[in-house]
Amino acid sequence: DSQAVEIAKIAEDCGVAAVAVHGRTREQYYSGRADWDIIKAVKEAVKIPVIGNGDIFSPQDAKAMREYTGCDGLMVGRAARGNPWIFKEINEYLKTGIVPEKPSAEEVKNMILKHASMLIEYKGEYTAVREMRKHIAWYTQGLPHSAELRRRCNEIVSWESLKEVIES
């Protein structure tokens, strides 16, 4: 706790414009709860903007962190895997108090194909379609028949086979 505050003060004194604080230690990795008290202590100790990170899995979590810590911004990590809509959901909830509807299966399918297409453009087909396997698992988590879809996706080796599986 005091180490985070000390480091943030040093960064501020060196002219840093903002700091991001993760409320979890390296030793914790993903276990246990993020300690939002650390984020709050840093926010109270410095004048520069503080970005809070740790255990933001929903719009409600984002609001709770902002209210509890007073942080100026939020950083979302694991909750964005397979859920790029979370940023819009958080923004909408913070503005209106209403959580938008989850994307439809069709919207998820279209996003998977767009994501894969962009990844292929960036990394090439061979690498991209293999990397998409884990992304597809994240995108489809909790959807009906997702276990069978994930099994089939683990066999994809080309853009064509990926499209065939996703569009079927």
Listing of model-derived features with the role each one plays in the protein:
Residues 3-18, 30, 37, 41-52, ...:
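Alpha/beta catalytic cores of nucleotide-metabolism and tRNA/nucleoside-modifying enzymes
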Residues 21-31:
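Glycine-rich, proline-tolerant flexible connector loops at the mouths of alpha/beta enzymes
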